[in-house]
Curated annotation (Swiss-Prot):
NCBIfam families (alphabetical): PRK13352.1, thiC
Keywords assigned by UniProt, alphabetized: 4Fe-4S, Iron, Iron-sulfur, Lyase, Metal-binding, S-adenosyl-L-methionine, Thiamine biosynthesis, Zinc
Binding-site residues for Zn(2+), renumbered to this chain: H269, H333
Entry similarity comment: Belongs to the ThiC family.
Organism encoding this protein: Thermoanaerobacter sp. (strain X514)
Name under which the protein is recorded: Phosphomethylpyrimidine synthase
Any GO BP annotation: thiamine diphosphate biosynthetic process
Length: 432
């Protein structure tokens, strides 16, 4: 049985109990959320070392980190390093987007070493292997994508991105209205190329019931991908994007009816003034399914700083109701991220997630900031560093920017605001 089927039967699973304890909520709250499809717990029955996380309504906003090999950088060891960096920095999940080297081995090593849920985009592997097996992506037999999905499911993948909403109906909207950047989703572009070349409907849509059978067998959470997501601000919230979202909403109902956990992916590049509307629309059309967003990135002119542009959008999206943020690294649009980029991306997304959790009133979120404020009032440097979202960086700044024996900080010195005000208020404080 899947987590959803257990919930529908009124059974609290081990995974639900772990999530409830982590979130500081009642088990019944998790049970009801999973039952309604408003919370998912990606947890493949074959991922043995998994510490499950819940994603959805009323829970803390989660962060995903993308890792994986490329043709130019096929070394699996580097991806394991990135995995460890991401988890240490606070990633709640990772996705293996490998397209180079031994893709199967990369995925299995990541699963073996990952305590957090692992996701994939099966179409990536199907496309890469189709080139070697059949000569091109468009020559791929329909059967092959399902063989790849089944293989990844057996390995223990917890959630998969599948671009099931890419249909000839949604493509018509794209053709009729046009775009500056057309399609920027890799999985989406592979799927559309196959559809147009073969003049056949998307097999993941056409044979959605077969996909559900595989997902149900292993309790994989389906992450319904947005193959028509906007790749620049100019293309945001157009008819093609919305048409795909309507189709995904219909598929959400079919997945739930089959007992399969499902979440929905959202747009990548969106102006700030459109973010809240996008989230509200998704929640309405997709029946309050958990919303997984890439960023969204709020301006197109900041290569090298897109961890910042995405954190801005992510905070607004999550505060508006999005549940799961896919990080963006400083290397976005420029190249494959290294482990330092991975850390920067995770930290930026975690900041966005936490800021949103405060706005949403998530249990315990505001209290973290109050504890930090009290540590600052007391000028307790050790406690401030401990409470930091990135303690290592905070510690380095404290050590490198100040004389080791001094109780003052190099910013304020004898003009410390805490010291001056405390003298007049009659409260004790060290100098900062």
């Amino acid at each position: 049985m899947t987590q959803l089927e257990y919930a529908l039967s009124g059974i609290v699973t081990k995974e639900m109990r772990i999530v409830a304890e982590y979130e500081g909520v009642d088990e019944e709250f998790i049970l009801e959320g999973v039952k309604k499809g408003e919370i998912v717990i990606p947890s493949n029955i074959n991922h043995k070392n998994l510490i499950p996380k819940g994603i959805g309504r009323g829970l803390s906003t989660k962060v995903n980190a993308n890792i994986g090999t490329s043709d130019a950088y096929p070394e699996i060891e580097k991806e394991i390093e990135k995995l460890n960096v991401a988890v240490k920095a606070g990633a709640d999940a990772v996705m293996d987007l490998s397209t180079g080297g031994d893709i199967n081995q990369s995925r299995r090593k990541i699963l073996e070493n990952s305590p957090v849920p692992v996701g994939t985009v099966p179409m990536y592997q199907a496309a890469v292997e189709s080139i070697s097996k059949y000569g091109s992506i468009v020559a791929m037999p329909e059967e092959f994508i399902f063989e790849v999905i089944e293989e990844q499911a057996k390995d223990g993948v917890d959630f998969i991105t599948v671009h099931c909403g890419l249909t000839f109906e949604s493509l018509k909207k794209l053709k009729d209205n046009g775009r500056v950047m057309d399609i920027v989703s890799r999985g989406g572009s592979f799927t559309i190329a196959w559809m147009l070349h073969n003049d056949k409907e998307n097999p993941l849509y056409k044979h959605f019931d077969r996909l559900l059978d595989i997902a149900k067998k292993y309790d994989i959470t389906l992450s319904l991908g947005d193959g028509l997501r906007p790749g620049c601000l100019e293309d945001a919230t157009d008819s093609a994007q919305i048409q795909e979202l309507i189709i995904l909403g219909e598929l959400v109902k079919r997945a739930r009816k089959a007992g399969v956990q499902v979440m929905v992916e959202g747009p990548g590049h969106v102006p700030i003034d459109q973010i809240e509307a996008n989230v509200k629309l998704q929640k309405q059309l997709c029946h309050n399914a958990p919303f997984y967003v890439l960023g969204p990135i709020v301006t197109d002119i900041a290569p090298g700083y897109d961890h910042i542009t995405s954190a801005i959008g992510g905070a607004i999206a999550a505060a508006s109701g999005a549940d799961f943020l896919c990080y963006v690294t400083p290397a976005e649009h420029l190249g494959l991220p290294d482990k330092e980029d991975v850390k920067e991306g995770v930290i930026a997304a975690k900041i966005a997630a936490h800021a949103a959790d405060i706005a949403k009133g998530v249990k315990g979120a505001k209290e973290k900031d109050l504890t930090m404020a009290r540590a600052r009032k007391a000028l307790n440097w050790d406690e401030q560093i401990k409470l930091s979202i990135d303690p290592d960086k905070a510690f380095k700044y404290r050590i490198n920017k100040n004389i080791s024996t001094a109780k003052t900080c190099s910013m304020c010195g004898k003009f410390c605001a805490m010291k001056i005000v405390s003298e007049y208020l009659g409260t004790s404080a060290m100098t900062c």
